């Protein structure tokens, strides 16, 4: 869910803006998977990113607009970004298709632009909180015409409204 979906700033032309389309779990022992889709009107690319259960919870909470009683780690990082006057320009998902995704944050403070490599799950959770675009390297995307569980997962989908705090 990238808030500024048309904006990516200065970026490699091989990157496309993505939206988080959901989080799924493919079995009792499986790790959660965050599903991303191309943000364009007719974009067909999709990408799944395996994350840990805590990171999946952080992403789901933000997607559903739920604020936990106390800030989680990603909420704290987002607050620190804002208080320090930093802007997250975008989160980039990249890497070689056979090695799995990697991620980096492209951020700035004043005129200084910086890049920091991070875990994909952290990049997604922070980008969602700071309403920054999530961009992915086209080479990582699967397409409708290629067989892939990324596009039609046999999963339990965690739907909006399924999370609550006591």
What residues fall within each predicted segment?
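Divalent-cation
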Residues: 4-166
């Amino acid at each position: 869910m990238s808030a500024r979906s048309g904006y990516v700033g200065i970026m490699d032309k091989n990157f496309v803006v993505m939206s988080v389309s959901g989080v799924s779990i493919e079995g009792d022992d499986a790790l959660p998977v965050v599903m991303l889709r191309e943000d364009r009107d007719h974009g067909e690319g999709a990408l799944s990113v395996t994350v840990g259960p805590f990171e999946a919870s952080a992403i789901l909470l933000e997607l559903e607009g739920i604020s936990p009683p106390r800030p989680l780690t990603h909420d704290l990082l987002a607050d620190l970004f804002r208080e320090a006057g930093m802007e997250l320009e975008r989160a980039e998902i990249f890497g070689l298709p056979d090695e799995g995704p990697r991620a980096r944050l492209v951020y700035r403070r004043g005129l200084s632009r910086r890049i920091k490599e991070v875990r994909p799950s952290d990049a997604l959770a922070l980008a969602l909180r700071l309403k920054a675009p999530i961009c992915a390297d086209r080479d990582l995307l699967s397409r409708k015409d290629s067989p892939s569980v990324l596009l039609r997962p046999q999963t339990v989908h965690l739907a909006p409204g399924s999370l609550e705090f006591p």
